[in-house]
Amino acid sequence: TAVEGARTIAELGRPRARAAVIGEPTGLKPVMAHKGMMMDEIRLLGQSGHSSDPSLSNNAMEAMHAVISDLMRYREELKSCYQSSLFDIPYPTLNLGSIHGGDNPNRICGHCNLQFDMRLMPGMHLEEVRADIRKRVHTVVDPLGIEFEHAVLFNGVPAFFAEENSELLETTESLTGHTGISVGFGTEG
């Protein structure tokens, strides 16, 4: 799902309530924290041409190789900066999920697209991460003469952490008999 139902209802002001309980697949265990999530795409445009003369072209796939290497460095930087023992995987993740480029083995790749997913820790902000990624990609591809476009595939869900002594968390823990848990997926919270 697009996990936008609760947000839409809140924006419409209906119904007016102090809080809401949103059903998620957690075995009735209340969620006190979840990672944020975003899905984006990096689109690179080079210059295609025949493979017999690469000097007349600009290979977008080779540029994407450099971008991927930098994204993997960024992933390690985030891992060292953001840690929380609340989560089974105690650091942010960046998954390189899908790559498409080129149109024929005997042609220089003129375009290459990379789709990725990130799971953000509390304290990380979606737009700041997106700005960091755009800056890093520009740093890699601008000297290569490659055009870059950034696309948001899913607006994202910010990371969540329940306020200390949350009345709603205490009530749901009491009603379910379960202590609040942290999950690595985004909820509508």
Where are these regions (language model features)?
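Acidic/histidine-rich catalytic neighborhood of metal-dependent amide-processing enzymes
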Residues: 1-39
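Short glycine-rich, acidic/polar surface loops and turns
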Residues: 26-29, 99-102, 183-189
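Short, solvent-exposed beta-strand/turn "edge" segments of beta-rich domains on protein surfaces
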Residues: 33, 104-109
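Hydrophobic beta-strand positions in extracellular immunoglobulin-like domains
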Residues: 44, 118-120
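Acidic-enriched catalytic cores of C-N bond-cleaving enzymes acting on peptides and small amides
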Residues: 51-99, 107-108, 122-148
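An extended, acidic, His-containing surface patch that forms the Zn2+-binding/catalytic region
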Residues: 80-86, 90, 95, 147-189
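The feature captures the short pre-catalytic strand/loop hairpin that immediately precedes
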Residues: 40-47
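Residue-level signal for inorganic ion chemistry
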Residues: 24, 64, 116
